[in-house]
């Protein structure tokens, strides 16, 4: 998956999810995922997740990430909106190039995020119809250069 310089995300057609149960991916961040954008460095980029109608800023659950200039690692987060209120929780850091397995399990009352064995429960109720949320760089900043993430559905 490639995010071009000056954009937030690659163009993709929407993907409807009917009775979603599990989103699972094999993920490796490449050297191109290193960046320094100054004051916005702590903003959380989005990797993948599920959004619910009417809009994912109302209810959604995603795995987020950012690059840590000090450690040289990728920080990973649970990232969500619950009834319009945003939340996040740090999960772990991984090395550039390291292969990891990430998943989001959709349950009736909540979601379980699993980042290579580190699990976190997000109190956003699952719904019968949603849509796939794909990689997005930012906050409000666009990608400072082209970034490639090896993201393979499993």
Predicted features along the sequence, with ranges:
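Short tryptophan-centered beta-strand motifs in secreted/extracellular beta-sheet-rich domains
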Residues: 25, 98-114
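Hydrophobic residues embedded in beta-strands of well-ordered beta-sheets
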Residues: 72-76, 109-113, 120
